[in-house]
């Protein structure tokens, strides 16, 4: 029996600067230990590749664009599960990819391929495409005009990597999460 504890520094996957991923710290410590079976070590090595940095370099999915910046994210949940005689590790990945250029399906295919290299099987269950409204659209201009009238500030709209509720409504604008103080 082995008990290991790993500590990280919490953060938001959309703004990872200064964060340390506890799952990476854990798997980096375990990935080469002879204590574990080869199959387990390969899983730990895969998790290290996925979480070695928050920008997709180790996983081979790094990309960026001028509008939204670099892809950022992590494989952020891993849970051991048993279903009858079947044992597996369920994982959840949260990657915010750029508005232009990268396509979620293509990035997903790369992750599935990478998992296969380590004897793992990955299945992409969901792809929430980036949401973007042109700052020159009437919708954004109207919201910004109201904002400037109420606050008296001459702020400019910007794009961030957060997942937004606005994608659920056509032509919706999310704002207020990063108001100037």
Positions of PLM-derived features:
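Structural signal for hydrophobic packing residues in well-ordered secondary-structure cores
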Residues: 30-38, 111, 115-119, 147, ...
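Metal-dependent peptidase/peptidase-like ectodomains
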Residues: 1, 15-23, 79, 84-88, ...
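Zn-dependent metallopeptidase/amidohydrolase metal-coordination segment
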Residues: 2, 83, 87-89, 94, ...
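Intrinsically disordered, low-complexity boundary segments flanking structured domains
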Residues: 58-64, 111, 159-161
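Midchain, well-structured core segments that form catalytic/ion-binding scaffolds
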Residues: 1-99
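General small-molecule cofactor/ligand-binding pocket signal
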Residues: 5, 123-125, 156-158
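Amphipathic, soluble alpha/beta structural segments
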Residues: 54-74, 123-152
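A short, flexible beta-alpha/helix-coil linker loop
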Residues: 9-12, 129, 180-181
């Amino acid at each position: 029996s082995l008990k290991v504890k790993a500590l990280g520094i919490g953060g938001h996957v959309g703004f990872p600067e200064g964060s340390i991923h506890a799952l990476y710290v854990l798997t980096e410590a375990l990935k080469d230990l002879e204590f574990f079976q080869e199959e387990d070590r390969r899983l730990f090595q895969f998790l290290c590749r996925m979480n070695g940095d928050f920008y997709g370099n180790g996983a081979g999915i790094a990309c960026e664009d001028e509008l939204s910046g670099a892809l950022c994210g992590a494989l952020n949940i891993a849970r051991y599960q048993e279903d009858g005689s079947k044992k597996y590790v369920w994982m959840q990945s949260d990657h915010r990819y750029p508005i232009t250029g990268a396509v979620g399906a293509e990035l997903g295919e790369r992750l599935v391929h990478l998992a296969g290299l380590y004897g793992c099987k990955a299945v992409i269950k969901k792809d929430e495409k980036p949401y973007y409204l042109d700052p020159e659209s009437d919708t954004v201009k109207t919201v910004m005009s109201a904002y400037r009238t109420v606050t008296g500030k001459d702020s400019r709209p910007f794009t961030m990597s957060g997942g937004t509720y606005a994608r659920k409504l056509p032509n919706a604008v999310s704002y207020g999460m990063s108001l100037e103080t």
